[in-house]
UniProtKB/Swiss-Prot annotation:
Residues annotated as binding Mg(2+): D66, D68, D117
Pfam families: CAA_C, NTP_transf_2, tRNA_NucTransf2
EC number: 2.7.7.72
Taxonomic lineage from the root: Archaea, Methanobacteriati, Methanobacteriota, Stenosarchaea group, Halobacteria
GO biological process annotation, one example: RNA repair
Amino-acid positions noted as binding ATP in the UniProt annotation, renumbered to this chain: S54, R57, H140, K160, Y169
Protein name (database record): CCA-adding enzyme
Keywords: ATP-binding, Magnesium, Metal-binding, Nucleotide-binding, Nucleotidyltransferase, RNA repair, RNA-binding, Transferase, tRNA processing
Enzyme class: transferase
Sequence positions that bind CTP: S54, R57, H140, K160, Y169
Stated role: Catalyzes the addition and repair of the essential 3'-terminal CCA sequence in tRNAs without using a nucleic acid template. Adds these three nucleotides in the order of C, C, and A to the tRNA nucleotide-73, using CTP and ATP as substrates and producing inorganic pyrophosphate. tRNA 3'-terminal CCA addition is required both for tRNA processing and repair. Also involved in tRNA surveillance by mediating tandem CCA addition to generate a CCACCA at the 3' terminus of unstable tRNAs. While stable tRNAs receive only 3'-terminal CCA, unstable tRNAs are marked with CCACCA and rapidly degraded.
Gene: cca
């Protein structure tokens, strides 16, 4: 078995950027900052530019090519002008860039092979004075830059490489993982990468860290790291319980059997239709997929709606006796036919233990001894002339009826209006009306577009 320090030394050698890589990034960042200042000079208001993020703090993993520049405008500038001037600067610096939207629009593009975000914000005095969420980012950068020495910075790189390798890195709402800022705060708080994983293996959520001891509220999240620049904010709010558990699992594995494997992301190969059918034959369950056009939304808006919709469909299936073994939302954005412009189709995919139910279902009333409620139940069915209803009769101590089941097959339910009555995301609901329903072997036809998430579904691991 490899010694842990030997493993980390090898990972550090390839994950920490070489001087030439750092110098190249710094040169490009300086060029971009100069271009930004030139664009600012053409505005009728004052502003400055600051580089933020991991590439500003030498805490990025080798190969990352992200440069984040924030243009800080006077706090008195209204939101409309901030957006107007911010976009003007962004398009001047990145003429081939495009607009994206966080709390307000910004420009994203490429320059000399680097991915660049040029974000306008307000130049507020403290993070507590923020006008929009992005205003706090320069304070994050200043806090960490003042505290991370070279050794801790290298340990941050190890932590990020580890989290990327296990699939738990990224605060986007698709991943729900560890943000870069959260990762750096944890390394700083625990004193290094090894102390972090040694601590994490024994965590019993909820776990809370408050670096500045200034929390002004309580939080309900499984991991709480109070923002040292904002006592009302949990930096780990986006982190899912699943990704926290995943981190703990691999922390234990790394310490028990040191290996470079957790630091090496593996892109799963897509399943083909034959692979899917092989899994179906072996599992003898009934898969179903509700497939529809993905709403034209950025991932941070799309994925919460897909998860909400999946939860609604799963509840609907379970409530009608089609017992769901496992389910997940999928998009074709990572499939081999994806064109890089985001998801075009989405699927709510579930594996069922039961796909067909009897024509009747049992409905229990209250115990006969509960006079008022029992009488109401009895009378409501005693006068029912529906020939498909059996009873009411007494079974044990209560009234029971057996009545016609609304849906006997899962296809009937998923193709009915009732399937759309569950809690769906607002934009998903519109597309859901034009859904396709696949049952059984028919789901294998999804493989060309959904092969990667299908492999993740049928070959799960921590």
């Amino acid at each position: 078995m490899d010694d842990l320090e030997a493993v980390l030394s090898r990972v550090r050698d390839r994950a920490v950027p070489e001087p030439a890589e750092r110098d190249r990034l710094r040169t490009v960042a300086v060029e971009l900052a100069d271009r930004t200042r030139e664009a600012i000079a053409d505005l009728p208001v004052d502003a400055d530019v600051v580089q933020v993020g991991s590439t500003a703090r030498d805490t990025w993993v080798s190969g990352d090519r992200d440069i984040d520049l924030f243009v800080r405008f006077d706090a008195a500038l209204d939101r409309e002008q901030l957006e107007e001037y911010g976009l003007a600067v962004g398009h001047a610096v990145l003429p081939d860039g495009h607009e994206e939207y966080a709390e307000h629009p910004y420009v994203k593009g490429t320059y000399e092979g680097f991915d660049v975000d040029l974000v306008p914000c307000h130049d507020v005095e403290t993070a507590g004075d923020l006008i929009s969420a992005v205003d706090r980012t320069p304070f994050h950068d200043a806090y960490l830059s003042a505290r991370l020495d070279e050794g801790l910075a290298d340990d941050v790189v190890l932590a990020k490489a580890f989290l990327k390798g296990i699939g738990a890195y990224g605060s986007d709402l698709r991943t729900e993982g560890f943000s870069g800022y959260l990762t750096e705060l944890l390394v700083l708080e625990l004193g290094g990468f090894v102390p972090l994983v040694e601590s994490a293996r024994s965590w019993h959520p909820p776990v809370e860290f408050d670096p500045e001891g200034h929390a002004e509220r309580t939080f309900d999240d499984p991991l709480v790291v109070v923002d040292p620049t904002d006592p009302t904010r949990n930096v780990a709010a986006v982190l899912s319980a699943e990704n926290l558990a995943r981190f703990q699992h691999y922390a234990r594995e790394l310490l028990a059997a040191p290996s470079e494997a957790p630091f090496e992301p593996v892109d799963p190969a897509p399943l083909d239709p034959t692979d899917v059918r092989d899994h179906l034959d072996r599992r003898e369950t009934t898969p179903v997929a509700v497939v529809f056009d993905a709403p034209d939304l950025v991932d941070d808006q799309l994925w919460p709606q897909l998860r909400r919709s999946l939860d609604g469909i799963v509840r609907g299936l379970n409530d009608r006796g089609f017992d769901v073994l496992r389910a997940r939302a999928m998009t074709d954005g990572s499939g081999p036919e994806a064109d890089g412009d985001g998801a075009k189709r989405a699927a709510l995919y579930a594996e069922l233990e039961v796909a067909e139910r009897p024509a009747v279902t049992r409905h229990e009333g209250p115990p006969v001894a509960v006079r008022k409620h029992a009488a109401s139940f009895y009378e409501s069915y005693a006068d029912d002339v529906d020939p498909e209803t059996y009873g009411p009769f007494i079974d044990g101590d209560r009234y029971v009826v057996e009545r016609e089941r609304e849906f006997t097959t899962v296809r009937e339910y998923l193709e009915s209006d009732a399937a759309g009555d569950v809690a769906l995301g607002a934009q998903v609901e519109r597309e859901f009306a034009e859904r396709d329903v696949l049952v059984g072997d028919a789901v294998a036809t999804l493989a060309p577009a959904f092969g990667v998430p299908l492999r993740e579904f049928y070959e799960p691991h921590p």
